[in-house]
Amino acid sequence: QAIDHTGLDVERNYHRYRRPLSPIIVRFDAETARDETAFAKFISDLTGARVEFSSSREESVEQLVARATGKVRWLSHEAAPQTALLAKGVSLDKRPIAQRGDIEVPRWLLEQSVCITYHRYGNINGGPKPVCPGLK
């Protein structure tokens, strides 16, 4: 849901969160708490963001880097391949899982601000009338 906090008559400033287009890879190992991986699955179900889990037992770091395209959430205690992922343009989040949903959930989504101007050179309703699906 998009929200306009400004309430201006001549402009709409929407703030919304969108699901990422590519899946988020969540890396974990034997030392990662089950609660963390369960919470990652819960957030995936809540937000609709696609999540792929990567275990250090089943996939090497090099294999993970080779297939990563969007974002990697690193819950593993092994060293994160930060340079290799950033060189591919892949976002890496090494922070621990936050206990508060208002802090944790936005980390799994894309933040977007949409501004629609309803004036042209000071003339209200004189500008273009763009249509943006999902905004009212």
Describe every region a protein language model picked out.
Residues 1-136:
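C-terminal segments
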